UniProtKB/Swiss-Prot annotation:
Name of this protein: NAD(P)H-quinone oxidoreductase subunit 6, chloroplastic
Originating organism: Triticum aestivum (Wheat)
Family affiliation: Belongs to the complex I subunit 6 family.
Record function comment: NDH shuttles electrons from NAD(P)H:plastoquinone, via FMN and iron-sulfur (Fe-S) centers, to quinones in the photosynthetic chain and possibly in a chloroplast respiratory chain. The immediate electron acceptor for the enzyme in this species is believed to be plastoquinone. Couples the redox reaction to proton translocation, and thus conserves the redox energy in a proton gradient.
One cellular component term from this protein's GO annotations in UniProt: chloroplast thylakoid membrane
Length: 176
């Protein structure tokens, strides 16, 4: 979106704040229904970021696929799980939770140190694909494919990782 600077910054800060609150809600809320709704809020905030970054296709795909399909699937899976199982579990912190927290904190700090030091120029190899698109030799579906493989490669891969993690979580919850 082409918004004035202060409005763009306010929306980015608001989206980041709501994203953090939603992420904490996913992790800290004990009721799995509330946690699933918090996940939906996180996915909507990610879509807001894509809108603010002028990636409208990725934003709409995020809304339709992840919020509209995957999150609804997770909510249905949580609703089919027996609710009394959640209230009986009094052991809130296990060794697996500690190990998972350690791995996640390590990944976050390594990303925080790696991303600012990375030269992203070599990753965006879009010159040739942009020349093909500008010549008008391909149709719209091919343009979407080229943009997903070049301009939106990193967001597309991150979305696929989110999908994989959500499917693993849904399968784990269904087995319990």
């Amino acid at each position: 979106m082409d918004l004035p600077g202060p409005i763009h910054e306010i929306l980015m800060l608001f989206g980041g704040f709501v994203l953090l609150l939603g992420g904490l809600g996913v992790v800290l809320l004990t009721n799995p229904i509330y946690s699933a709704f918090s996940l939906g809020l996180v996915l909507v905030c990610i879509s807001l970021f894509y809108f603010l970054l002028n990636s409208y296709f990725v934003a709409v795909a995020q809304l339709l696929i992840y919020v509209g399909a995957i999150n609804v699937l997770i909510i249905f899976a949580v609703m089919f799980v027996n609710g009394s199982e959640w209230s009986k579990d009094k052991n809130y912190w296990t060794i697996g939770d500690g190990f998972t927290s350690l791995v996640c904190i390590t990944i976050v700090f390594s990303l925080m140190t790696t991303i600012p030091d990375t030269s992203w120029y070599g990753i965006l190899w879009t010159t040739r694909s942009n020349q093909i698109v500008e010549q008008g030799l391909i149709n719209n579906v091919q343009q979407i494919g080229i943009h997903l493989a070049t301009d939106f490669y990193l967001p597309f891969e991150l979305i696929s990782i989110i999908l994989l993690v959500s499917l693993i979580g849904a399968i784990t919850m269904a087995r319990q």
